[in-house]
């Protein structure tokens, strides 16, 4: 098993890159397929470890899955209510099966989730939502169990616009009696994609993409065909790669509205970004400017792009401040970037980055998915050779990242 990336200073990236289907869209959509009584066909499924885990998880419940060349066929006949630790420990998104199983069978038992080590990321908002709908929740021996004879629509206010909680409650509510209203709901494009898929199956959901989502309960959901939206974080990552290396790259299969905040920040740096028929063209500039960033829930600047932008800021002209408001403990890439010569100071949830002349290659490790991506980007511009360990994190969220970069002229390979 090749466990590290070796990256050498690369020429400006040039060419075209096609963005894969969105990981953060496909995981809840696969979970939602458990609600259907007929066959579901999903297209543009990214070939990722997290997706394989989610497929294994729904197979555990009795789903029949056939994945071929990005097309996933799912037939559901739920035989079990329990999701075991072996599967759930691999990623947090496993918990998204709780809403559908509870809605379909009135009983779900899911192991407490694992996944990326980013701060607390509690599931309490999910559980409060299920309780509001009438479920009894018990927690013990590492499992969460939910039971309900019948779920009933309610008004649910989320203390924080959590994406996972919004999705899980939305799925749990599709069969509930009456109307469920989620207030302070997350507005991410992935929520809209999930709602569109549920509606294709026969759900009655309005307001996805706003802070108030209204779900009118229905009796059953039928089969549907759906193409997953492109991955806005992968798109953003390749936009930054093109910008940092002074390249000229066409990003294909991107929904421009989904990356507006990234476009705004890169443009502020001096990068030239234009919409073309095939997608977005990103042209880097020499001596780009430092910019300040504050991560926020969508449509604000995504926390999932914070590490990549920090890598870019390490050699920008001037000083930038990055404030992380979404997740705690999300500066784990800082110590690794410092090993490469970056000048970064951390104070609480703020990072101050003073641009240096150049980074130097070093041996570093990916501590999580986006940290790994940031180190790959830093390696592209660092003098000499960078070795990035623990790249299994990167494989959880990027389809063949090194192959896509190599096709643009990057010097990167697995070892």
UniProtKB/Swiss-Prot annotation:
Its main location: cytoplasm. The active site is at residue 116. Pathway: Cell wall biogenesis; peptidoglycan biosynthesis. It is an enzyme of class 2 (transferase). Phosphoenolpyruvate binds at residues 23-24. One of its GO terms (cellular component) is cytoplasm. Its EC number is 2.5.1.7. It holds the Pfam family EPSP_synthase. It is found in: Cytoplasm. GO terms for molecular function: UDP-N-acetylglucosamine 1-carboxyvinyltransferase activity. The modification 2-(S-cysteinyl)pyruvic acid O-phosphothioketal is found at residue 116. The keyword Iron does not apply. UDP-N-acetyl-alpha-D-glucosamine binds at residues 92, 121-125, 304, 326. GO terms for biological process: cell division; cell wall organization; peptidoglycan biosynthetic process; regulation of cell shape; UDP-N-acetylgalactosamine biosynthetic process. Transmembrane segments: none annotated. Belongs to the EPSP synthase family. MurA subfamily. This is UDP-N-acetylglucosamine 1-carboxyvinyltransferase 1. It comes from Caldanaerobacter subterraneus subsp. tengcongensis (strain DSM 15242 / JCM 11007 / NBRC 100824 / MB4). The gene is murA1.
